Protein backbone atom coordinates (compact mmCIF):
# COMPACT_ATOMS: atom_id res chain seq x y z
CA UNK A 1 0.00 0.00 0.00
CA UNK A 2 2.95 2.36 0.41
CA UNK A 3 4.06 2.67 -3.27
CA UNK A 4 1.00 4.59 -4.62
CA UNK A 5 1.26 7.25 -1.87
CA UNK A 6 3.81 9.45 -3.68
CA UNK A 7 1.57 9.45 -6.79
CA UNK A 8 -1.55 10.60 -4.91
CA UNK A 9 0.17 13.36 -2.98
CA UNK A 10 1.24 15.42 -6.02
CA UNK A 11 -2.25 15.11 -7.53
CA UNK A 12 -3.91 16.54 -4.42
CA UNK A 13 -1.42 19.37 -4.33
CA UNK A 14 -2.06 20.17 -8.00
CA UNK A 15 -5.79 20.53 -7.31
CA UNK A 16 -5.09 22.86 -4.40
CA UNK A 17 -2.75 24.97 -6.50
CA UNK A 18 -5.35 25.39 -9.28
CA UNK A 19 -7.89 26.86 -6.85
CA UNK A 20 -5.47 29.16 -5.07
CA UNK A 21 -4.16 32.59 -6.12
CA UNK A 22 -0.93 33.26 -7.98
CA UNK A 23 0.88 34.18 -4.79
CA UNK A 24 -0.25 31.03 -3.01
CA UNK A 25 0.68 28.92 -6.01
CA UNK A 26 4.26 30.11 -5.93
CA UNK A 27 4.57 29.38 -2.22
CA UNK A 28 2.82 26.07 -2.57
CA UNK A 29 5.06 25.01 -5.38
CA UNK A 30 8.08 25.90 -3.31
CA UNK A 31 6.84 23.72 -0.47
CA UNK A 32 6.01 21.01 -2.97
CA UNK A 33 9.47 21.12 -4.46
CA UNK A 34 11.03 20.82 -1.05
CA UNK A 35 8.78 17.98 0.05
CA UNK A 36 9.17 15.78 -3.00
CA UNK A 37 12.80 16.56 -3.82
CA UNK A 38 14.30 13.14 -4.53
CA UNK A 39 17.73 12.00 -3.53
CA UNK A 40 20.54 12.19 -6.08
CA UNK A 41 20.09 8.45 -6.65
CA UNK A 42 16.41 8.82 -7.62
CA UNK A 43 15.26 8.38 -11.22
CA UNK A 44 14.84 11.28 -13.63
CA UNK A 45 11.13 10.50 -14.14
CA UNK A 46 10.30 11.36 -10.56
CA UNK A 47 12.20 14.69 -10.75
CA UNK A 48 10.51 15.62 -14.03
CA UNK A 49 7.04 14.92 -12.65
CA UNK A 50 7.75 17.04 -9.56
CA UNK A 51 9.12 20.03 -11.51
CA UNK A 52 6.33 20.16 -14.08
CA UNK A 53 4.14 22.69 -12.18
CA UNK A 54 7.12 24.78 -11.02
CA UNK A 55 7.42 28.44 -11.94
CA UNK A 56 10.21 30.06 -13.94
CA UNK A 57 12.15 30.85 -10.77
CA UNK A 58 12.25 27.18 -9.83
CA UNK A 59 13.19 26.19 -13.37
CA UNK A 60 16.45 28.06 -12.91
CA UNK A 61 17.37 25.65 -10.13
CA UNK A 62 17.27 22.61 -12.42
CA UNK A 63 20.53 21.20 -13.69
CA UNK A 64 20.56 21.44 -17.49
CA UNK A 65 23.92 19.74 -17.86
CA UNK A 66 23.46 17.00 -20.48
CA UNK A 67 19.78 16.53 -19.55
CA UNK A 68 20.58 15.89 -15.91
CA UNK A 69 17.34 17.69 -14.88
CA UNK A 70 18.09 17.34 -11.20
CA UNK A 71 16.42 20.01 -9.07
CA UNK A 72 17.96 21.77 -6.09
CA UNK A 73 16.47 24.01 -3.40
CA UNK A 74 19.15 26.71 -3.53
CA UNK A 75 21.55 28.15 -6.13
CA UNK A 76 24.51 27.27 -3.93
CA UNK A 77 23.59 23.58 -4.00
CA UNK A 78 23.17 23.64 -7.78
CA UNK A 79 26.53 25.32 -8.28
CA UNK A 80 28.28 22.84 -6.00
CA UNK A 81 26.58 19.94 -7.80
CA UNK A 82 27.83 21.10 -11.21
CA UNK A 83 31.37 21.71 -10.00
CA UNK A 84 31.72 18.39 -8.19
CA UNK A 85 29.55 16.07 -10.29
CA UNK A 86 29.92 17.29 -13.88
CA UNK A 87 33.13 19.34 -13.97
CA UNK A 88 35.08 17.04 -11.69
CA UNK A 89 38.70 17.36 -10.73
CA UNK A 90 42.04 16.48 -12.18
CA UNK A 91 42.98 14.49 -9.09
CA UNK A 92 40.01 12.15 -9.59
CA UNK A 93 40.71 11.85 -13.33
CA UNK A 94 37.27 13.14 -14.35
CA UNK A 95 38.01 16.78 -15.21
CA UNK A 96 35.71 18.19 -17.89
CA UNK A 97 36.60 21.63 -19.28
CA UNK A 98 33.71 21.91 -21.76
CA UNK A 99 30.44 23.46 -20.62
CA UNK A 100 27.52 21.17 -21.53
CA UNK A 101 24.73 23.36 -20.16
CA UNK A 102 22.06 23.06 -22.83
CA UNK A 103 23.94 23.99 -26.03
CA UNK A 104 26.66 26.22 -24.57
CA UNK A 105 29.75 24.13 -25.44
CA UNK A 106 32.21 26.69 -24.08
CA UNK A 107 35.68 25.22 -23.66
CA UNK A 108 38.26 26.55 -21.21
CA UNK A 109 41.82 25.62 -20.33
CA UNK A 110 41.62 25.63 -16.53
CA UNK A 111 39.14 24.43 -13.95
CA UNK A 112 38.92 27.87 -12.36
CA UNK A 113 37.82 29.31 -15.69
CA UNK A 114 34.97 26.90 -16.22
CA UNK A 115 33.77 27.18 -12.62
CA UNK A 116 33.65 30.94 -13.10
CA UNK A 117 31.80 30.46 -16.38
CA UNK A 118 29.18 28.26 -14.72
CA UNK A 119 28.01 31.27 -12.68
CA UNK A 120 26.52 32.67 -15.88
CA UNK A 121 24.03 29.80 -16.01
CA UNK A 122 23.36 29.44 -12.28
CA UNK A 123 21.24 32.15 -10.56
CA UNK A 124 23.89 32.56 -7.87
CA UNK A 125 24.63 36.20 -6.96
CA UNK A 126 26.74 36.23 -3.80
CA UNK A 127 28.51 39.52 -4.56
CA UNK A 128 26.50 42.53 -3.43
CA UNK A 129 27.26 46.22 -3.87
CA UNK A 130 27.60 48.07 -0.59
CA UNK A 131 26.37 51.32 -2.10
CA UNK A 132 23.10 50.28 -3.74
CA UNK A 133 22.63 46.66 -2.61
CA UNK A 134 22.63 45.19 -6.12
CA UNK A 135 23.86 41.60 -6.43
CA UNK A 136 26.15 40.16 -9.08
CA UNK A 137 27.22 36.68 -10.09
CA UNK A 138 30.94 37.25 -10.49
CA UNK A 139 33.36 39.49 -8.60
CA UNK A 140 34.53 41.14 -11.80
CA UNK A 141 30.96 42.19 -12.54
CA UNK A 142 30.73 43.81 -9.13
CA UNK A 143 34.06 45.55 -9.70
CA UNK A 144 32.79 47.10 -12.92
CA UNK A 145 29.60 48.20 -11.21
CA UNK A 146 31.42 49.78 -8.27
CA UNK A 147 33.22 52.11 -10.67
CA UNK A 148 29.90 53.74 -11.49
CA UNK A 149 29.76 55.07 -7.94
CA UNK A 150 33.20 56.68 -8.19
CA UNK A 151 31.78 59.99 -9.41
CA UNK A 152 29.66 60.32 -6.26
CA UNK A 153 32.17 59.53 -3.56
CA UNK A 154 35.72 58.41 -3.01
CA UNK A 155 35.74 54.65 -2.57
CA UNK A 156 37.09 53.12 0.59
CA UNK A 157 38.13 49.63 1.46
CA UNK A 158 35.29 47.23 2.19
CA UNK A 159 36.70 46.24 5.58
CA UNK A 160 36.68 49.83 6.79
CA UNK A 161 33.92 52.13 7.83
CA UNK A 162 32.69 54.11 4.82
CA UNK A 163 32.90 57.26 6.93
CA UNK A 164 36.51 56.55 7.92
CA UNK A 165 38.14 57.38 4.60
CA UNK A 166 38.73 60.72 2.95
CA UNK A 167 35.28 61.00 1.43
CA UNK A 168 34.37 64.18 -0.34
CA UNK A 169 30.63 63.62 -0.09
CA UNK A 170 29.72 60.43 1.73
CA UNK A 171 26.74 58.81 0.08
CA UNK A 172 24.31 56.80 2.23
CA UNK A 173 23.41 53.37 0.87
CA UNK A 174 20.32 53.36 -1.30
CA UNK A 175 19.27 49.90 -0.21
CA UNK A 176 19.79 47.54 2.71
CA UNK A 177 23.45 46.78 3.13
CA UNK A 178 24.59 43.21 2.73
CA UNK A 179 25.38 41.13 5.77
CA UNK A 180 28.68 39.97 4.29
CA UNK A 181 31.34 41.98 2.52
CA UNK A 182 33.52 41.00 -0.46
CA UNK A 183 35.85 38.92 1.65
CA UNK A 184 33.06 36.94 3.27
CA UNK A 185 33.55 38.52 6.70
CA UNK A 186 30.64 39.63 8.82
CA UNK A 187 30.19 43.37 9.04
CA UNK A 188 28.95 45.53 11.83
CA UNK A 189 25.77 47.54 11.67
CA UNK A 190 27.67 50.83 11.79
CA UNK A 191 28.71 50.50 8.16
CA UNK A 192 25.12 50.13 6.94
CA UNK A 193 23.88 53.45 8.28
CA UNK A 194 24.42 56.99 7.12
CA UNK A 195 26.12 59.84 8.96
CA UNK A 196 25.04 59.71 12.59
CA UNK A 197 24.13 62.66 14.75
CA UNK A 198 27.01 61.97 17.09
CA UNK A 199 29.56 63.33 14.63
CA UNK A 200 30.73 66.92 14.98
CA UNK A 201 28.62 69.64 13.49
CA UNK A 202 29.55 70.71 10.00
CA UNK A 203 31.48 67.50 9.42
CA UNK A 204 29.42 66.27 6.49
CA UNK A 205 31.76 67.83 3.99
CA UNK A 206 34.81 67.93 6.24
CA UNK A 207 37.75 65.61 5.59
CA UNK A 208 37.68 62.43 7.58
CA UNK A 209 40.69 60.98 9.40
CA UNK A 210 42.85 58.86 7.17
CA UNK A 211 43.31 55.18 7.94
CA UNK A 212 44.95 54.08 4.70
CA UNK A 213 48.49 55.43 4.64
CA UNK A 214 50.74 57.39 6.89
CA UNK A 215 51.40 59.93 4.16
CA UNK A 216 47.87 61.25 4.26
CA UNK A 217 47.46 64.50 6.10
CA UNK A 218 44.43 64.97 8.35
CA UNK A 219 43.86 68.68 7.85
CA UNK A 220 41.89 70.37 10.64
CA UNK A 221 39.02 72.58 9.46
CA UNK A 222 40.36 76.10 8.95
CA UNK A 223 37.18 77.78 7.82
CA UNK A 224 33.89 75.92 8.07
CA UNK A 225 32.52 77.68 5.01
CA UNK A 226 35.25 76.29 2.72
CA UNK A 227 36.19 72.96 4.26
CA UNK A 228 34.59 70.98 1.46
CA UNK A 229 37.38 72.03 -0.91
CA UNK A 230 39.99 70.95 1.62
CA UNK A 231 38.46 67.50 1.86
CA UNK A 232 38.38 67.15 -1.89
CA UNK A 233 42.00 68.15 -2.32
CA UNK A 234 43.14 65.85 0.49
CA UNK A 235 41.68 62.77 -1.17
CA UNK A 236 44.52 62.28 -3.63
CA UNK A 237 47.20 63.79 -1.42
CA UNK A 238 48.80 60.49 -0.50
CA UNK A 239 49.56 59.44 -4.05
CA UNK A 240 50.90 62.89 -5.03
CA UNK A 241 53.09 63.09 -1.96
CA UNK A 242 54.52 59.60 -2.52
CA UNK A 243 55.20 60.55 -6.13
CA UNK A 244 56.96 63.73 -5.00
CA UNK A 245 59.22 61.82 -2.63
CA UNK A 246 60.07 59.36 -5.39
CA UNK A 247 61.06 62.22 -7.70
CA UNK A 248 63.19 63.81 -4.96
CA UNK A 249 64.89 60.47 -4.30
CA UNK A 250 65.60 60.04 -8.02
CA UNK A 251 67.06 63.54 -8.16
CA UNK A 252 69.29 62.84 -5.16
CA UNK A 253 70.47 59.59 -6.72
CA UNK A 254 71.28 61.27 -10.04
CA UNK A 255 73.17 64.03 -8.26
CA UNK A 256 75.22 61.55 -6.21
CA UNK A 257 76.12 59.50 -9.28
CA UNK A 258 77.31 62.68 -11.04
CA UNK A 259 74.72 62.29 -13.76
CA UNK A 260 74.01 66.01 -13.31
CA UNK A 261 76.84 68.47 -13.81
CA UNK A 262 76.65 70.97 -10.90
CA UNK A 263 78.33 73.62 -13.05
CA UNK A 264 75.93 73.33 -16.02
CA UNK A 265 72.85 75.52 -15.68
CA UNK A 266 71.13 73.73 -18.56
CA UNK A 267 71.51 70.28 -16.97
CA UNK A 268 70.38 71.60 -13.60
CA UNK A 269 67.30 73.17 -15.16
CA UNK A 270 66.37 69.94 -16.95
CA UNK A 271 66.81 67.85 -13.82
CA UNK A 272 64.75 70.24 -11.68
CA UNK A 273 61.94 70.57 -14.22
CA UNK A 274 59.90 67.60 -12.85
CA UNK A 275 60.00 69.14 -9.37
CA UNK A 276 58.59 72.51 -10.43
CA UNK A 277 55.27 73.02 -8.69
CA UNK A 278 55.32 69.52 -7.18
CA UNK A 279 57.79 69.95 -4.36
CA UNK A 280 55.99 70.41 -1.04
CA UNK A 281 58.27 69.28 1.77
CA UNK A 282 58.69 72.38 3.95
CA UNK A 283 59.74 72.07 7.57
CA UNK A 284 56.80 74.18 8.65
CA UNK A 285 53.36 75.09 7.36
CA UNK A 286 52.87 78.01 5.03
CA UNK A 287 51.61 81.21 6.55
CA UNK A 288 49.52 84.23 5.58
CA UNK A 289 47.37 82.27 3.12
CA UNK A 290 44.99 80.24 5.26
CA UNK A 291 42.20 82.78 4.99
CA UNK A 292 42.01 82.74 1.21
CA UNK A 293 43.30 79.58 -0.42
CA UNK A 294 43.30 76.00 0.91
CA UNK A 295 46.85 74.85 1.37
CA UNK A 296 47.94 71.26 0.78
CA UNK A 297 49.29 69.38 3.70
CA UNK A 298 53.02 69.65 4.29
CA UNK A 299 54.45 66.17 4.14
CA UNK A 300 56.29 64.92 7.21
CA UNK A 301 60.00 65.12 6.62
CA UNK A 302 60.78 62.20 8.90
CA UNK A 303 60.55 58.54 8.06
CA UNK A 304 58.15 57.66 10.86
CA UNK A 305 54.47 56.85 10.49
CA UNK A 306 51.72 59.39 10.90
CA UNK A 307 49.49 58.75 13.94
CA UNK A 308 46.18 57.24 13.06
CA UNK A 309 43.04 56.71 15.08
CA UNK A 310 42.75 53.08 14.01
CA UNK A 311 45.43 50.93 15.69
CA UNK A 312 45.29 48.27 12.99
CA UNK A 313 45.51 50.74 10.10
CA UNK A 314 48.16 50.18 7.49
CA UNK A 315 51.08 52.57 7.86
CA UNK A 316 53.33 53.65 5.04
CA UNK A 317 56.91 54.71 5.51
CA UNK A 318 58.98 57.04 3.35
CA UNK A 319 61.88 55.14 1.82
CA UNK A 320 64.65 57.35 0.49
CA UNK A 321 67.67 55.13 -0.16
CA UNK A 322 69.66 57.95 -1.76
CA UNK A 323 69.61 60.02 1.45
CA UNK A 324 69.83 57.41 4.17
CA UNK A 325 73.04 58.04 6.09
CA UNK A 326 74.71 61.15 7.40
CA UNK A 327 77.37 60.98 4.71
CA UNK A 328 74.71 60.88 2.05
CA UNK A 329 73.01 63.97 3.43
CA UNK A 330 76.28 65.90 3.72
CA UNK A 331 77.30 64.90 0.20
CA UNK A 332 73.91 65.89 -1.21
CA UNK A 333 74.03 69.21 0.64
CA UNK A 334 77.42 69.96 -0.92
CA UNK A 335 76.16 69.16 -4.41
CA UNK A 336 73.04 71.25 -3.87
CA UNK A 337 75.24 74.12 -2.76
CA UNK A 338 77.22 73.92 -5.99
CA UNK A 339 74.00 73.83 -8.00
CA UNK A 340 72.67 76.82 -6.09
CA UNK A 341 75.83 78.77 -6.89
CA UNK A 342 75.51 77.88 -10.57
CA UNK A 343 71.88 79.01 -10.65
CA UNK A 344 72.79 82.23 -8.91
CA UNK A 345 75.58 82.95 -11.38
CA UNK A 346 73.07 82.77 -14.23
CA UNK A 347 70.79 85.37 -12.65
CA UNK A 348 71.97 88.06 -15.10
CA UNK A 349 70.83 86.02 -18.09
CA UNK A 350 67.61 84.74 -16.53
CA UNK A 351 66.47 88.23 -15.48
CA UNK A 352 67.81 90.19 -18.47
CA UNK A 353 65.08 92.32 -20.04
CA UNK A 354 62.38 91.52 -17.48
CA UNK A 355 60.33 94.59 -16.58
CA UNK A 356 60.25 94.65 -12.81
CA UNK A 357 58.73 96.69 -10.01
CA UNK A 358 60.94 97.62 -7.12
CA UNK A 359 60.20 96.77 -3.54
CA UNK A 360 58.74 100.21 -2.87
CA UNK A 361 55.35 99.22 -4.28
CA UNK A 362 54.43 97.30 -1.17
CA UNK A 363 54.95 93.73 -2.40
CA UNK A 364 57.72 91.77 -0.77
CA UNK A 365 59.30 94.85 0.71
CA UNK A 366 60.66 93.22 3.82
CA UNK A 367 62.23 89.80 3.75
CA UNK A 368 64.25 87.75 6.18
CA UNK A 369 65.14 84.69 4.11
CA UNK A 370 67.75 84.37 1.36
CA UNK A 371 65.17 82.96 -1.04
CA UNK A 372 64.23 84.87 -4.21
CA UNK A 373 61.59 87.56 -3.72
CA UNK A 374 58.21 86.15 -4.51
CA UNK A 375 54.72 85.84 -3.21
CA UNK A 376 53.16 82.77 -1.72
CA UNK A 377 51.94 80.26 -4.24
CA UNK A 378 48.67 78.48 -3.92
CA UNK A 379 48.26 74.81 -4.95
CA UNK A 380 46.87 75.95 -8.30
CA UNK A 381 49.95 78.00 -9.08
CA UNK A 382 48.43 81.46 -8.44
CA UNK A 383 50.43 84.04 -6.54
CA UNK A 384 49.07 84.96 -3.14
CA UNK A 385 50.50 87.99 -1.43
CA UNK A 386 51.49 88.00 2.19
CA UNK A 387 48.94 90.70 2.99
CA UNK A 388 46.00 89.25 1.10
CA UNK A 389 44.76 87.34 -1.88
CA UNK A 390 46.33 89.38 -4.68
CA UNK A 391 47.49 87.72 -7.90
CA UNK A 392 50.89 88.92 -9.05
CA UNK A 393 52.34 88.17 -12.46
CA UNK A 394 55.92 87.26 -13.13
CA UNK A 395 56.59 90.70 -14.57
CA UNK A 396 55.67 92.43 -11.30
CA UNK A 397 58.15 90.45 -9.21
CA UNK A 398 61.29 92.12 -7.98
CA UNK A 399 64.49 91.15 -9.70
CA UNK A 400 66.80 89.05 -7.54
CA UNK A 401 69.67 91.41 -8.32
CA UNK A 402 67.88 94.70 -7.69
CA UNK A 403 65.56 93.94 -4.79
CA UNK A 404 67.46 95.14 -1.73
CA UNK A 405 66.17 94.42 1.74
CA UNK A 406 65.99 96.92 4.58
CA UNK A 407 69.44 95.96 5.80
CA UNK A 408 71.07 96.67 2.45
CA UNK A 409 71.83 93.07 1.57
CA UNK A 410 70.71 91.69 -1.77
CA UNK A 411 67.58 89.55 -1.89
CA UNK A 412 69.30 86.50 -3.30
CA UNK A 413 72.56 85.53 -1.70
CA UNK A 414 74.91 82.78 -2.66
CA UNK A 415 75.27 79.56 -0.75
CA UNK A 416 76.81 79.86 2.66
CA UNK A 417 78.85 76.71 2.12
CA UNK A 418 80.94 78.30 -0.65
CA UNK A 419 83.12 81.34 -0.03
CA UNK A 420 83.64 83.76 -2.88
CA UNK A 421 87.16 85.08 -3.25
CA UNK A 422 86.51 87.25 -6.29
CA UNK A 423 84.73 90.56 -6.57
CA UNK A 424 81.57 89.17 -8.09
CA UNK A 425 79.74 88.15 -4.92
CA UNK A 426 76.85 90.53 -4.25
CA UNK A 427 77.35 92.55 -1.11
CA UNK A 428 76.08 95.90 0.24
CA UNK A 429 79.08 97.73 -1.17
CA UNK A 430 79.17 95.91 -4.49
CA UNK A 431 75.46 95.80 -5.20
CA UNK A 432 75.89 98.63 -7.71
CA UNK A 433 78.11 96.41 -9.81
CA UNK A 434 75.09 94.66 -11.30
CA UNK A 435 74.27 95.98 -14.78
CA UNK A 436 70.60 96.26 -13.89
CA UNK A 437 71.05 98.21 -10.68
CA UNK A 438 73.03 100.98 -12.37
CA UNK A 439 70.13 102.18 -14.49
CA UNK A 440 67.90 104.85 -13.10
CA UNK A 441 64.62 103.99 -14.81
CA UNK A 442 62.82 100.76 -15.49
CA UNK A 443 62.67 101.48 -19.21
CA UNK A 444 66.43 101.30 -19.55
CA UNK A 445 66.56 98.01 -17.67
CA UNK A 446 65.04 96.27 -20.68
CA UNK A 447 68.40 96.25 -22.46
CA UNK A 448 71.31 96.20 -20.01
CA UNK A 449 74.91 96.42 -21.14
CA UNK A 450 78.01 94.86 -19.73
CA UNK A 451 80.71 97.33 -18.65
CA UNK A 452 84.19 97.11 -20.09
CA UNK A 453 85.74 97.24 -16.64
CA UNK A 454 84.45 97.11 -13.11
CA UNK A 455 85.16 99.93 -10.65
CA UNK A 456 87.55 99.38 -7.82
CA UNK A 457 85.96 98.62 -4.47
CA UNK A 458 87.39 99.33 -1.07
CA UNK A 459 87.05 95.69 0.02
CA UNK A 460 89.99 94.50 -2.04
CA UNK A 461 88.30 93.99 -5.40
CA UNK A 462 90.43 94.74 -8.44
CA UNK A 463 89.61 95.70 -11.99
CA UNK A 464 87.95 92.93 -14.01
CA UNK A 465 87.24 92.65 -17.69
CA UNK A 466 84.01 91.37 -19.18
CA UNK A 467 85.67 88.09 -20.15
CA UNK A 468 86.36 87.31 -16.49
CA UNK A 469 82.82 87.83 -15.22
CA UNK A 470 82.57 84.57 -13.33
CA UNK A 471 83.52 83.11 -9.99
CA UNK A 472 87.15 82.22 -9.41
CA UNK A 473 86.77 78.88 -7.69
CA UNK A 474 89.39 76.17 -7.68
CA UNK A 475 91.45 75.03 -10.64
CA UNK A 476 88.51 73.35 -12.35
CA UNK A 477 88.60 74.45 -15.99
CA UNK A 478 85.00 73.44 -16.49
CA UNK A 479 83.85 75.62 -13.63
CA UNK A 480 85.90 78.64 -14.63
CA UNK A 481 84.86 78.62 -18.28
CA UNK A 482 81.16 78.15 -17.65
CA UNK A 483 80.49 81.66 -16.38
CA UNK A 484 82.49 83.56 -18.99
CA UNK A 485 81.23 81.58 -21.98
CA UNK A 486 77.61 81.94 -20.95
CA UNK A 487 77.93 85.69 -20.48
CA UNK A 488 79.59 86.22 -23.86
CA UNK A 489 77.06 84.04 -25.64
CA UNK A 490 74.06 85.92 -24.30
CA UNK A 491 75.55 89.37 -24.97
CA UNK A 492 75.53 88.87 -28.75
CA UNK A 493 72.03 90.09 -29.74
CA UNK A 494 72.12 93.05 -27.33
CA UNK A 495 73.78 95.72 -29.59
CA UNK A 496 70.72 95.93 -31.88
CA UNK A 497 68.42 97.52 -29.27
CA UNK A 498 71.24 99.89 -28.23
CA UNK A 499 71.50 101.24 -31.74
CA UNK A 500 67.81 102.12 -31.62
CA UNK A 501 68.04 103.81 -28.23
CA UNK A 502 71.23 105.69 -29.09
CA UNK A 503 69.75 107.06 -32.31
CA UNK A 504 66.45 107.97 -30.73
CA UNK A 505 67.63 111.40 -29.61
CA UNK A 506 65.96 113.19 -32.56
CA UNK A 507 63.33 110.81 -33.92
CA UNK A 508 60.80 111.79 -36.53
CA UNK A 509 57.15 111.93 -35.59
CA UNK A 510 56.12 109.64 -38.45
CA UNK A 511 58.75 107.04 -37.59
CA UNK A 512 57.78 107.00 -33.94
CA UNK A 513 54.10 106.65 -34.78
CA UNK A 514 54.86 103.88 -37.25
CA UNK A 515 56.97 101.98 -34.76
CA UNK A 516 54.27 102.22 -32.13
CA UNK A 517 51.37 101.24 -34.35
CA UNK A 518 53.03 98.43 -36.27
CA UNK A 519 51.41 95.11 -35.31
CA UNK A 520 54.45 93.11 -36.35
CA UNK A 521 56.74 95.04 -34.04
CA UNK A 522 54.27 94.70 -31.18
CA UNK A 523 54.00 90.96 -31.69
CA UNK A 524 57.79 90.58 -31.78
CA UNK A 525 58.18 92.60 -28.60
CA UNK A 526 55.40 90.69 -26.86
CA UNK A 527 56.88 87.32 -27.84
CA UNK A 528 60.33 88.36 -26.72
CA UNK A 529 58.97 89.75 -23.46
CA UNK A 530 56.97 86.61 -22.83
CA UNK A 531 60.02 84.45 -23.49
CA UNK A 532 62.12 86.48 -21.08
CA UNK A 533 59.43 86.28 -18.41
CA UNK A 534 59.18 82.52 -18.85
CA UNK A 535 62.94 82.24 -18.58
CA UNK A 536 62.85 84.31 -15.41
CA UNK A 537 60.06 82.15 -13.97
CA UNK A 538 62.08 79.00 -14.66
CA UNK A 539 65.13 80.50 -13.01
CA UNK A 540 63.07 81.57 -10.00
CA UNK A 541 61.47 78.13 -9.69
CA UNK A 542 64.88 76.47 -9.90
CA UNK A 543 66.13 78.64 -7.06
CA UNK A 544 63.06 77.84 -4.97
CA UNK A 545 63.40 74.09 -5.51
CA UNK A 546 67.11 74.10 -4.64
CA UNK A 547 66.48 76.10 -1.47
CA UNK A 548 63.62 73.81 -0.47
CA UNK A 549 65.78 70.72 -0.97
CA UNK A 550 68.63 72.24 1.02
CA UNK A 551 66.26 73.13 3.86
CA UNK A 552 64.98 69.56 3.84
CA UNK A 553 68.49 68.07 3.94
CA UNK A 554 69.68 70.49 6.62
CA UNK A 555 66.57 69.83 8.68
CA UNK A 556 67.27 66.11 8.68
CA UNK A 557 70.86 66.73 9.66
CA UNK A 558 69.84 69.00 12.52
CA UNK A 559 67.24 66.54 13.80
CA UNK A 560 69.65 63.62 13.19
CA UNK A 561 67.09 61.76 11.11
CA UNK A 562 69.45 59.40 9.38
CA UNK A 563 70.78 55.88 9.77
CA UNK A 564 74.02 55.60 11.66
CA UNK A 565 76.90 54.20 9.64
CA UNK A 566 77.88 51.79 12.43
CA UNK A 567 74.31 50.70 13.06
CA UNK A 568 73.15 47.49 11.45
CA UNK A 569 70.21 47.70 9.08
CA UNK A 570 68.20 45.23 11.16
CA UNK A 571 68.33 47.34 14.29
CA UNK A 572 67.59 50.57 12.43
CA UNK A 573 64.14 51.78 11.58
CA UNK A 574 64.71 51.54 7.86
CA UNK A 575 62.30 50.40 5.24
CA UNK A 576 62.20 46.94 3.73
CA UNK A 577 63.81 48.37 0.62
CA UNK A 578 66.95 49.16 2.67
CA UNK A 579 67.60 45.59 3.82
CA UNK A 580 71.27 44.71 3.48
CA UNK A 581 72.03 41.04 2.75
CA UNK A 582 75.33 41.34 4.63
CA UNK A 583 75.40 39.95 8.14
CA UNK A 584 75.99 42.37 11.04
CA UNK A 585 78.79 40.09 12.23
CA UNK A 586 80.58 40.19 8.89
CA UNK A 587 84.34 40.76 9.01
CA UNK A 588 85.50 44.36 8.62
CA UNK A 589 86.17 45.58 5.12
CA UNK A 590 89.62 46.21 3.82
CA UNK A 591 91.01 49.70 3.84
CA UNK A 592 90.14 51.61 0.69
CA UNK A 593 86.78 49.94 0.01
CA UNK A 594 83.57 51.90 0.62
CA UNK A 595 81.29 50.83 3.44
CA UNK A 596 77.53 50.33 3.31
CA UNK A 597 75.66 53.60 3.30
CA UNK A 598 78.37 55.52 1.43
CA UNK A 599 77.93 57.09 -1.96
CA UNK A 600 76.42 54.92 -4.67
CA UNK A 601 78.72 55.89 -7.54
CA UNK A 602 82.03 54.03 -7.91
CA UNK A 603 85.14 55.52 -6.35
CA UNK A 604 88.30 55.39 -8.46
CA UNK A 605 91.40 54.82 -6.35
CA UNK A 606 94.59 56.50 -7.47
CA UNK A 607 97.64 54.22 -7.72
CA UNK A 608 99.87 54.54 -4.71
CA UNK A 609 97.16 56.15 -2.59
UniProtKB/Swiss-Prot annotation:
Zinc finger (C2H2-type): 61-86, 97-121, 127-149
The entry's keywords: Activator, Cytoplasm, DNA-binding, Metal-binding, Nucleus, Repeat, Repressor, Transcription, Transcription regulation, Zinc, Zinc-finger
Bias-annotated ranges (Basic and acidic residues): 143-154, 562-581
Molecular-function GO term, any one: DNA binding
Residue ranges annotated as motif YPX[LI] motif 1: 447-450
Function according to Swiss-Prot or TrEMBL: Transcription factor that mediates regulation of both acid- and alkaline-expressed genes in response to ambient pH. At alkaline ambient pH, activates transcription of alkaline-expressed genes (including pacC itself) and represses transcription of acid-expressed genes. Specifically recognizes and binds the consensus sequence 5'-GCCARG-3'. May act as a negative regulator of virulence to plants.
Top-level taxonomic group: Eukaryota
Subcellular location: Cytoplasm; Nucleus
Chain's gene name: pacC
Modification after translation (UniProt): Activated by C-terminal proteolytic cleavage. At neutral to alkaline ambient pH, the signaling protease cleaves pacC within the conserved 24-residue signaling protease box. In an ambient pH-independent reaction, the processing protease (probably the proteasome) removes additional C-terminal residues to yield the functional form.
Skewed-composition ranges (Polar residues): 405-414, 438-456, 502-513
Record-stated family: Belongs to the pacC/RIM101 family.
PANTHER family reported for this sequence: PH-RESPONSE TRANSCRIPTION FACTOR PACC/RIM101, PH-RESPONSE TRANSCRIPTION FACTOR PACC_RIM101
Protein known as: pH-response transcription factor pacC/RIM101
A GO BP entry: positive regulation of transcription by RNA polymerase II
Classification via PROSITE patterns: ZINC_FINGER_C2H2_1 (PS00028), ZINC_FINGER_C2H2_2 (PS50157)
Biased composition (Low complexity): 11-57, 415-437
Organism: Fusarium oxysporum f. sp. lycopersici (strain 4287 / CBS 123668 / FGSC 9935 / NRRL 34936) (Fusarium vascular wilt of tomato)
Region (Disordered): 1-58, 143-178, 294-314, 405-531, 562-609
Motif stretch (YPX[LI] motif 2): 601-604
GO CC terms in record: cytoplasm; nucleus
Pfam families tied to this protein: zf-C2H2
Amino acid sequence: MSPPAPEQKPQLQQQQQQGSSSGDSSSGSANDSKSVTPAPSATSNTSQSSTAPSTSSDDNLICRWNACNQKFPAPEALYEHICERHVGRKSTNNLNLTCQWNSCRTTTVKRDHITSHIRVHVPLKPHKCEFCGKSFKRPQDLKKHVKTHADDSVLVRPSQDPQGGLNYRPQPPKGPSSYYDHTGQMRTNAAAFAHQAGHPSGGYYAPQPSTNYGLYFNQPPINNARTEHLGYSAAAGGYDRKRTYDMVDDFFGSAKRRQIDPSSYAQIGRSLMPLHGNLSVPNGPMTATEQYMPQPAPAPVHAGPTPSKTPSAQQYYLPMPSARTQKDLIHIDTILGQMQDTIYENANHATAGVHIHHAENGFNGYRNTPSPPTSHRSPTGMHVGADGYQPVSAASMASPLTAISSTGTPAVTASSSMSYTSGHSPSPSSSAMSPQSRHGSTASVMYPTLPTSLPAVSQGFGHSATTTLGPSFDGSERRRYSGGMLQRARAGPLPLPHEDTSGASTPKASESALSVGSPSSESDVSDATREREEQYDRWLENMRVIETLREYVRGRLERKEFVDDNESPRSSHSDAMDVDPKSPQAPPRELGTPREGSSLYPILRMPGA
